[in-house]
Regions:
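Carbohydrate transferase catalytic cores enriched for Leloir-type hexosyltransferases
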Residues: 1-230
Length: 230
């Protein structure tokens, strides 16, 4: 059995009863398209097409309950009300199951004018969004791997993520890890990343190095080895 993270491996053993000796962790990797070498002209053209400016807060993934977007929305609302944050929050991802709660929360908090939902973006556009964002916020209650976090690291985008599921092993020390439901902690961490240039620069430089530990060549070699040993 192949698991895409140690967290998934533990779940297969603990929840499904898979024999530990039969479960091998083989990590995924980010598409090289997300590397940090997008040209300024390409990034600027993408921002113009999407009517965005640099420095926005970004969340990537399907809109569904496990992504825990209401917590992010409440933290964002707090920053707008208490700290005067004016940059938009961009939600990039399709509508999943029970997505209505996200839009109900947006309406209840009066955020309709400052939260942008981009339901369909190409990988090339997403790569430019990572390059232009002030930070990626990834507050999921659970991820089996968490490709958006790895993509953002690869692109040199500061990452603030949940400390649940696979995210600690994917993000490592290259991002900030938080309890997923602590609105105060999310507001504080996002404010730090968006306003502390030294912290943001440290995370931008740490991201590609962390992402470099996950390559498709390693994934392919480990998968081939697993098949040969079956």
């Amino acid at each position: 059995i192949s698991a895409d993270s140690e967290a998934t491996r533990r779940d297969l053993i603990d929840l499904v009863g898979a024999p530990p000796a039969r479960v091998t962790t083989i990590h995924l990797a980010a598409n090289p398209l997300f590397a940090a070498d997008r040209s300024l002209a390409e990034v600027d053209a993408t921002l113009t097409a999407l009517r965005l400016e640099r420095g926005f807060l970004l969340a990537v993934g399907t809109l569904e309950p496990r992504k825990n977007l209401p917590t992010l929305l409440r933290a964002y609302d707090r920053l707008r009300r208490e700290a005067g944050l004016r940059m938009p929050l961009v939600l990039a991802g399709g509508k999943g199951w029970l997505y209505d709660d996200v839009f109900r929360t947006i309406d209840a908090l009066g955020l309709a004018g400052c939260v942008r939902h981009l339901e369909s973006v190409s990988d090339a556009q997403l790569a430019c969004l990572y390059r232009a964002a002030g930070a990626l916020a990834f507050p999921s209650h659970y991820e089996g791997f968490g490709l958006p976090a790895l993509e953002a690291l690869h692109a040199g985008c500061p990452v603030v993520a949940s400390n649940r599921g696979s995210l600690p092993e994917v993000v490592g020390a290259a991002g900030l890890l938080l309890e997923p439901d602590d609105v105060d902690a999310w507001a504080e961490a996002l404010w730090r990343v968006l306003t502390d240039d030294a912290l943001a620069d440290r995370l931008r430089h740490a991201g590609p190095a962390q992402a470099g530990q996950f390559t498709w060549a390693r994934t392919a070699a480990a998968t081939l080895s697993l098949y040969h040993g079956a």
